[in-house]
């Protein structure tokens, strides 16, 4: 809409965030601007819980899941690696049998995040309007990606990348 276009033209990152970032705070001057941290909140929470288990309680074997974002360390009680199953996005679309991909959590990474546009959408005729908003346009994403899975050391980082990938086109991610 024209209101979204006006806001997009008049607001930059520097206009939104003010202050000294060394004090670990952000400040916004314009009341119309809203900040949301949905893109990393669940992953960050999983990281904080995992760090608490590890560094505060001395627990070295755990798996933490917060809203689908996972952080794991060590092994299961049977000394086997943690195994995470990821639903194939086409399962939701075609009403077929659940297809699962299995990911072994090992020493190469400790976190996994999955983001997708195959569950939260509105169908208007032949057009699908997804829940991911492209900050470049202020409109629902027009991505050709159905789901993104990211494996890394920190769930917050995996969560951020998976969310970002869902508004990008495949050609932008893998040139």
Give the residues covered by each predicted segment.
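Mature catalytic core of soluble alpha/beta enzymes
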Residues: 1-175
């Amino acid at each position: 809409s024209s209101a979204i276009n006006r806001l997009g033209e008049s607001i930059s990152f520097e206009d939104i965030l003010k202050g000294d970032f060394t004090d670990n705070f952000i400040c916004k001057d314009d009341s119309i601007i809203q900040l949301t941290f949905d893109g990393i909140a669940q992953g960050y929470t999983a990281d904080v819980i995992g760090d608490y288990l590890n560094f505060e309680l001395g627990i070295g074997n755990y798996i933490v899941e917060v809203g689908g974002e996972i952080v794991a360390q060590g092994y299961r009680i049977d000394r086997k690696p943690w195994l995470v199953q990821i639903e194939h996005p086409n399962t939701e679309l075609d009403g077929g049998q659940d297809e699962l991909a299995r990911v072994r959590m090992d020493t190469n990474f400790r976190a996994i995040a999955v983001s997708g546009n195959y569950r939260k959408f509105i169908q208007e005729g032949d057009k699908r309007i997804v829940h991911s908003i492209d900050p470049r346009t202020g409109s629902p994403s027009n991505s050709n990606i159905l789901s993104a899975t990211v494996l890394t050391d920190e769930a917050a980082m995996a969560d951020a990348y998976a969310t970002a990938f869902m508004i990008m086109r495949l050609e932008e991610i893998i040139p």
